[in-house]
Amino acid sequence: MTELGPTDSAKELIERIARALVDHPDQVRVTAVQGENTSVIELTVAKEDMGKVIGKQGRIAIAIRTLLNNVSMKARKRFVLEIIE
């Protein structure tokens, strides 16, 4: 079993969390745009699932970003989460 790189680990984490939250897990897509020191993790979900991923007053999105920040500290690479409709 090969070890995942930091960006792949971050993508997998976001995908698992999003699939657990939404009603249409088959429509969850996670892609990464890598830069030298920063990677943008793009999360795409079904339109009707946007509220479940964002949460009231953005609380779920903030919690997901907090977890992603913890991964970035360990990896010494900055990750930014973008939630795309």
Q: Where do the model's predicted regions map?
A:
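Glycine-centered tight-turn and secondary-structure capping sites
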Residues: I54-G58
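RNA-contacting regions in translation and RNA-metabolism proteins
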Residues: M1-M50, A63, L67-E85
